[in-house]
Amino acid sequence: MSALVAFVIAGACVPAPSPAPVAVADNAAVKAAFERHADSVEVTASGAVDRLLSDQDGPSGPHERFIVRLPDVAMTVLVEHNLSIAPRVPVVVGEHVDVHGEYVWNAQGGLLHFTHHDPDGSHEGGYIVYAGKRYD
C-alpha cells in the first residue's frame, strides 16, 4: 500500500507540460508582406484592436472578425478567427492583442487567418494572445 501512495504522490509532482511557445511579434514583417503583395506568409502581429466587425460565415465555418492597428508600421490588418475550430476571443476596442497566423494580401492592409490550431496537421498552427490568455 505504501508503494502505491508513494507512486501517486510522485506522479502529482510531475510538472505540467509547458504551453506552446509564443512567437515574437514582428509588425515589420507584416508591412513587408503587404508591400510585396504576399500571400501565405506566417507572421506575428501586435497592436490594439481598432474595430470590431460582425461575424462572417465562410466555407470553413463562422469567423470572428476584428481590425488590429499596428502602430509602429502605420497600418491595420483584418483578423479572421475561425470559431468552428477555436473559441471566440473576447476582444475589446483599444485593448492589446498578439496574433499569429497566415497573412493574405489585400489593398486594405491584408488579413490574418489560420489564427487557431490546425486540427489536421497540414498547416502551421496560429493563435491569438489577449489579456494574458492564449486562444488557439
Give residue ranges: language-model regions.
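Bacterial N-terminal signal peptides
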Residues: 2-11
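OB-fold and OB-like single-stranded nucleic-acid-recognition modules
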Residues: 10-136
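Short, low-complexity, intrinsically disordered N-terminal peptides in bacterial proteins
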Residues: 1-2, 18
